[in-house]
Design a protein with these regions (language model features):
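Non-transmembrane, aqueous-exposed alpha-helical and coiled segments at domain scale
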Residues: 1-186
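A short, hydrophobic C-terminal helix/tail in secreted or cell-surface proteins
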Residues: 187-191
């Protein structure tokens, strides 16, 4: 469990919802109307061209390795977020998210030639923000949601008396002769 938790760092896995919130704040600071499709398209095109946001060319909250047509988690979450945004009087903010989702799908599909779906990270940061949760808790919440699954996988491994899973890899390093520890002449065998 500790290894799983420690693996969560950065915008690709665990921190993407924070990047979405930051992207939306950046969008609002660079356009007059963040619900206007034309202005949003111009901004997102600049993001893709690495001329806006963090210069990485990524529209955060878009795309998934498995869910290419639609992320069912995002579909469900969108409904909850819409309801809460109405309760909180954040309809315009919700409209911005919907506009960004629509335009980003169009731009990314045109660029890649493949359908691109919004993922669960797109809406989760907005939800956490509406619930007044500190950004420092976004990744731990991401982890908590997965702990039952991680535990179930571990229980399956133990219950099936299965072999240790080892990822396949091919070493690309030049072969070196074995040197017994007693023969080391420097503090490190790599020196």
């Amino acid at each position: 469990m500790a290894a799983s938790l420690c693996a969560l760092k950065g915008p690709r896995h665990g921190g993407a919802n924070i990047k979405v919130v930051e992207m939306m704040a950046d969008l609002k600071s660079h356009v007059d109307d963040p619900t206007d499709e034309g202005q949003v398209r111009e901004y997102l095109q600049a993001v893709l061209d690495k001329k806006a946001l963090d210069g990485l060319g990524l529209i955060y909250g878009m795309g998934h390795a498995v869910y290419s047509l639609s992320d069912p988690r995002a579909e469900v979450l969108r409904g909850f977020v819409r309801d809460i945004s109405k309760e909180k009087g954040l309809n315009r903010e919700m409209d911005m998210y919907l506009t960004v989702e629509k335009v980003a799908k169009e731009l990314l599909t045109a660029r890649t030639g493949k359908p691109v779906a919004v993922n669960v990270d797109f809406y989760s940061g907005f939800l956490y923000d509406m619930l007044d949760l500190p950004k420092e808790l976004y990744t731990p919440l991401f982890a908590i949601a997965r702990m039952a699954g991680w535990s179930a996988h571990r229980m399956e491994e133990l219950g099936e008396n299965s072999k240790i899973i080892r990822p396949a890899c091919k070493c690309i390093e030049k072969r070196r002769p074995y040197v017994p520890c007693l023969l080391y002449t420097s503090p490190s065998p790599r020196d």
